[in-house]
Amino acid sequence: MLKRFLIPVLLFAGVHAIAQNKLDSYEQTIAGTNLSFKMVAIPGGSFKMGSISGGKEDEKPAHEVKLDPFWMGQYEVTWDLFEPFLYKDYEIAKSKDGKVAPEIDAVTRPTKPYLDMTFGFGKEGHPALAMTHYNAIQFCKWLYVRTGVFYRLPTEAEWEYAARGGAKTAYFFGDNDTQLGEYAWFKDNADQKTHVVGEKKPNPWGLYDIYGNVGEWTYDQYKADSYAEGKDKVLINPVVVPTTLYPNVVRGGAFDSAAADLRSAARGASDPIWKQLDPQVPKSNWWFPEAPFVGMRLVRPVNPPSHEEIMAYYDKKPIKDF
């Protein structure tokens, strides 16, 4: 039996009455800075999660999932937004008054990496990458302290639903991958590097780079047989709670992925080998020195839970690495 999330379900679901109302996309500004990011309204609804025919075994059985509406980042999180979280001095430099409020200063920040975590791919407009699952959640916490808005990682179900954009085919544009280069940076066209977000066409719901460029963290623990729980059922706002450090689900494929790994149903998983070069003992909670292909995208639920529930989500103690 899969363990389900113990923190109240409001963290991952909206109140039903609100869920019936139309959501509007918006741009989130960060007070005291010139930073902002765009969030796209994703309508609630039901869909078949997984692969009906073809695909890999961990994508089966296809099962019915019902989701409340939510907002999702129009783009993958870029270094422009992520770097002020990493370094207080950089955040001060980006602030309009040269100061950082005490409550912001109190947010735990990553240890300074010993490598160039851009891997030479580029910084301005490029997706932030190689952060751990824990690091990604702490970035969401920093945004919450900065904006007062609850941002989190998407669940695996939310990610696939949003990526499909209402389509039932292998890719949101059809079952054949011949058009993939119009929408995604992947092995055939990326030249082994990330690219500035938003250069390709968006999916039907206005999400850019949902396939390729960098893989994207979801909150869920990866279990190869997790879809069996949905057989002959309708799962409502499902999530598989992480109870071990590895593996967690990564979706969307990356710049070095084959076309088949960019399908809406394709599942990826984190691996301890991503820290093989990390000289620290124990391994860093913050960085994957051998994963320049994983990044993140934000989600915001329709109705926020209480501050205490939000902090319980953010402040789960990191699981010690090997």
Each PLM stretch: what is its role?
Residues Q28, M49-L67, T194-K200, L262-P279:
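Short, polar loop/linker segments at the starts of domains and inter-domain junctions
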Residues T33-M49:
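Mature N-terminal segment immediately following signal peptide/propeptide cleavage
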Residues F5-A13:
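Sec-dependent N-terminal signal peptides
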Residues A184-Y211, V241-T244:
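Short, well-ordered junction/capping motifs at the entry into regular secondary structure
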Residues A62, P110-G125, N189-Q192, L277-P282:
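Short glycine/proline-rich turn/loop motifs
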Residues M49-S51, K66-F173, D220-Y227, R300-F322:
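Active-site microenvironments of metalloenzymes and redox enzymes
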Residues N21, K201-N203, L235-F322:
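Disulfide-stabilized, aromatic/cysteine-rich ligand-recognition loop
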Residues V15-A19:
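Sec/Tat signal peptide C-region and signal peptidase I cleavage site
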